[in-house]
Amino acid sequence: MANSDEIHYDLVEDDEFDIVNIVVEGLDETSIHSPPPSVSAATHGGVKNPSFSQRRTSGRHDFQKWLHEELGKYPAKTHAQKVVEELDAPKSGLIYLRGFNEPLYPYSDQGPPFRQQRHFFYLSGADFPGCAVTYDIPRQHLIVWIRRNDPRLSLWYGTTPSIEEVKSKSDVSDVRYIDDVTKYLHANLTPDTTLFLLHPDQTPKLEPPSLNLRHRFKGPKIDTTSLLPAIEAARVIKTPHEISLIRRAVALTSLAHRMVLQRIKHLSNEREAHAVFEGFCISQGAPRQSYAVIAASGANASTLHYEANDQPLEGKQTMLLDAGCEWGCYASDVTRTFPLKGKWTKEGEEIYKVVERMQRETIDAIRPGRLYYKLHLVACLVAVEELMKLGILHNGTRTEILAKGTVAAFFPHGLGHHVGLEVHDVSGRERLLLSSSSSSGLSRQAISGSRRLPPPRNMKREQVTPEDLAAMYREAMMDTAGDEVEQSAVAPPPPYRGRQRLKENMVVTVEPGIYFHRPYIQSFFLSNPDHAKYINTKVLDRYWDVGGVRIEDCILVTKDGYENLTTAPKGKEALKIINAGIPGFPCDGKA
């Protein structure tokens, strides 16, 4: 089938399975193994959407067949080779990583669900506890080391994957029992070998003490500083296998968002929206979320990482649903904002259209070579223009207000981040937007009375303060060459240090938002004459009840442009689904 990479589908209602029935264009038995379908997926940059002469209805079975199809072995050896390229390793070297063990809460025999160390998984594909991995650089020999199955433990917890099962799922040179890893290290580490570790604490200890690696090797022979940046740099550009897993995570997440839209008129509390989303993901084989679900109604939507999800929906205008499941340890990240009753208030619709334009214009600008921070500035410029039209911002030109950073009162976070094994994935040797030392920002300094506050919990988006935004603007004004031309290596002044360019096969989010968080705006903008003069409080008073609007999609950077992987309904399509609704409650036997 020509252009089988692009399969488009829409969900249709059926008496039995309303949520997962799919109208598929061009899907037949030969195309079921093609890259994942996408609802109205946007692909731009010289790639034409295919047209198909045949359409047929396909139900739950076909979607699940595609979702669960075998993708081949996890490319662990390819990943190891990518790491070595970034490592610039000597001819004689060996990489050694330990995976995680089962976690326990302090002073308890219980613990959270197991979650594998992501750098370890990248080099092994082993998503279970008690493992290690070694990579002999000159021999290109990758070994995963696993525990033996203990019948006493299997009685309680079941068996862990066998040597044969690990070999069948991961492209590795060998799989062995971890009992023998010490013997292997002793045999393969010579005075000429450099042992690469993530951290000094991971230095293996050999017995007797005279064989301890800390004793045998000194100085540069144990390298605990080079491996971490090398792995993080390698993870930035995704392999085709990784992209396939992210596609599935985003596709399932998009269906779960649609599920919530279909049910929302029948729900009465934020927790029910949370339950519908997460329950659908679990039912389709995705028990883990990439991050804690945010189901924020009304003013709660102005809290960026709202966690309670326990407030009644009665009397609220909108819901902001930020949720994404994992698939095969790879994350998704999608946000939709919608009116709970299927019809916007005047103020809510106005703000939604602002954010809609912010996202549309930034996504349309994505292509390889683009400086990501300039996309953030595009979103900010659109926000300034639109908020001036509404009268919320005034008393200055758009350039003046942007240069002051005042729009950060309403758009206080970064445009997006990488997505991969983590929802806020590593960015390599360059920051996508901000340096880690600057991500905590402005007014945190004022809040705490000290230079910085500790990093917040569950932080998956970076704060952008007026100072940060002003620094980005100054940098852009000095950056006279085109986006695709490499600039001087001289770092811009603090706090802004992010100069990462988009490259093919990066996956990033684009998640602009406008928020009306009263304590933040009043404390750090309306009380500051430098910003207060640009904010019309009489007009602003009409918008507090909107809370916040955010729209977030996962974007794959392609050779000539981008592909929007996210197919969750938004805009008019979302309103249509809300108002069509479904009869009954989600547990009535449907979906």
Curated annotation (Swiss-Prot):
Binding site for Mn(2+) 2: D322, D333, E552
GO MF annotation terms: manganese ion binding; metalloaminopeptidase activity
Binding, Mn(2+) 1: D333, E511, E552
GO biological process annotation, one example: proteolysis
InterPro entries: Aminopep_P_N (IPR007865), Creatin/AminoP/Spt16_N (IPR029149), Creatinase/aminopeptidase-like (IPR036005), Pept_M24 (IPR000994), Peptidase_M24B_aminopep-P_CS (IPR001131), X-Pro_dipept-like (IPR052433)
UniProtKB keywords: Aminopeptidase, Hydrolase, Manganese, Metal-binding, Metalloprotease, Protease
Textual note on the cofactor: Binds 2 manganese ions per subunit.
Record's function text: Catalyzes the removal of a penultimate prolyl residue from the N-termini of peptides.
Official protein name in the record: Probable Xaa-Pro aminopeptidase PEPP
Organism: Sordaria macrospora (strain ATCC MYA-333 / DSM 997 / K(L3346) / K-hell)
Classification lineage: Eukaryota, Fungi, Dikarya, Ascomycota, Pezizomycotina
